[in-house]
């Protein structure tokens, strides 16, 4: 398995962050705990929003979809990683690796685009409150979400198809927790210039443009908030954006730690940074969006109260 060219029938070895059995046991329980917290947190957000008519608004519509994306994202990577940590067989098939890569790339892009749309929603709510209902109509919300999905699916498809033309030689040991694009490209022994060029071009379109849009939106939002004469209204306006700003900072901060570096400098140490955006960010989002949100507190309280009453 260590020599020759990559074929569809061959495999990769996902070695994870450590090959020490003792450390692997610790990592297993740590990632299992994080996975369960992520699943429970995001499922509760989705159920609370879908079951409470008071939360059937654009901002919560996009939040529910962000939670669904995060739920799908961790399920794409962590279960396989947990199996590998408990098993002596750490192999993942070529097809399995490409499938994992496709969903990973697509869902990161989708997360990014939904955060950009949520920034636009906050901009309209703060800067144009009188036009909010018409500017963020249900039809437009569905259209924006559909556009996010289409662009993300195409983005993932482009990079996965390009990866199929890459040849891998020598060791196929991946010192990572999942099949990550930069790691696979580093293992290639064929020309990856096209992959690299397309990665930069599509990355600018899918990530940099939405990120710039988020920055501009928040500059305008902060300007609008500073013009509000009442201190209490200023605080209320800022608090409605604080959770989204926290999620944006966590997402882009962890993403920059991994991807804002030359391809040839990618190292095993980057696996820790990858865990931040692949595991920690989806786990933290439910806490960020519900911690200081009274509407979400109320919806979660009513949801849990209703289910506890059914049990008693």
Swiss-Prot record:
Tissues where the protein occurs: Expressed in testis. Expressed in spermatozoa (at protein level). Expressed in olfactory epithelium.
Cytoplasmic domain ranges by topology: 50-57, 121-139, 220-236, 292-312
GO molecular function, one term: identical protein binding
Residues on Extracellular side: 1-25, 80-100, 159-196, 260-271
Annotated compartments: Cell membrane
Keyword Cell membrane assigned: yes
The protein's name: Olfactory receptor 1D2
The organism of origin for this protein: Homo sapiens
Gene name in the database record: OR1D2
């Amino acid at each position: 398995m260590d020599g020759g060219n990559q074929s569809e029938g061959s495999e990769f070895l996902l070695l994870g962050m450590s090959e020490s059995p003792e450390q692997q046991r610790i990592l297993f329980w740590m990632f299992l705990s994080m996975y369960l917290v992520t699943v429970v947190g995001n499922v509760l957000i989705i159920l609370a929003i879908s079951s409470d008519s008071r939360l059937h608004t654009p901002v919560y519509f996009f939040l529910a979809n962000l939670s669904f994306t995060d739920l799908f994202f961790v399920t794409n990577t962590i279960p396989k990683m947990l199996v590998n940590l408990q098993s002596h067989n750490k192999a993942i098939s070529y097809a399995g690796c490409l499938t994992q890569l496709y969903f990973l790339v697509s869902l990161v892009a989708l997360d990014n685009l939904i955060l950009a749309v949520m920034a636009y929603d906050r901009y309209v709510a703060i800067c144009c409150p009188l036009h909010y209902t018409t500017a963020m109509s249900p039809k437009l919300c569905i259209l924006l979400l559909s556009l996010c999905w289409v662009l993300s699916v195409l983005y993932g498809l482009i990079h996965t198809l390009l990866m199929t033309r890459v040849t891998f030689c020598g060791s196929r040991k991946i010192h990572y927790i999942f099949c990550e694009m930069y790691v696979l490209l580093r293992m290639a022994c064929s020309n990856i210039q096209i992959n690299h060029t397309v990665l930069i071009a599509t990355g600018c379109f899918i990530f940099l443009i939405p990120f710039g849009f988020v920055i501009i939106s928040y500059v305008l939002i902060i300007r609008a908030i500073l013009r509000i004469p009442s201190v209490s209204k200023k605080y209320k306006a800022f608090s409605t954006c604080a959770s989204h700003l926290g999620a944006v900072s966590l997402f882009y901060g962890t993403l920059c730690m991994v991807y804002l570096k030359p391809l040839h400098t990618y190292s095993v140490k980057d696996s820790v940074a990858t865990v931040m955006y692949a595991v920690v960010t989806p786990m933290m989002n439910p806490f960020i969006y519900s911690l200081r949100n009274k509407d979400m507190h109320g919806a979660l309280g009513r949801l849990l109260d209703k289910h506890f009453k059914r049990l008693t």
